[in-house]
Amino acid sequence: MKAFIAVLGTGMALAGMVAGVATAAQPGGPGQIARGQEKYEYWCATCHAGDPREGGRYLPGTASLNAKYKGERPGALADRTDLLPPYVKLVIRRGMEGMPFFRKTEISDAEMEDIAAYLARNTKQ
């Protein structure tokens, strides 16, 4: 009986975790996405904008992602369809490869949530 209760408890915990991940992966509403776009333009687009600059060159973040994915995924973050909010938030706070991290004094938790919602808006669930 104890083994059954332990298995049942583990199963319920896993179900709760899966439900929590599914809920966390949903992008926010129109207001949050609009705020996220504004913050993305200010903090992120300086390196990750999708349009080429003078001379046809992309910005450093977009260029490095274009080279990394070799056409399998867009280099421009705003064009991606595979970004989940938890991943976006992790990269904002910890940085990645050549990208710096951002402190809470630079991008607040609320702003980070908005940016994550904006970048996840096209993600297929």
Sequence positions of predicted segments:
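N-terminal export/targeting leaders of redox proteins
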Residues: 1-30, 123-125
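Axial heme c-ligation environment in periplasmic c-type cytochrome domains
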Residues: 70-83, 87-122
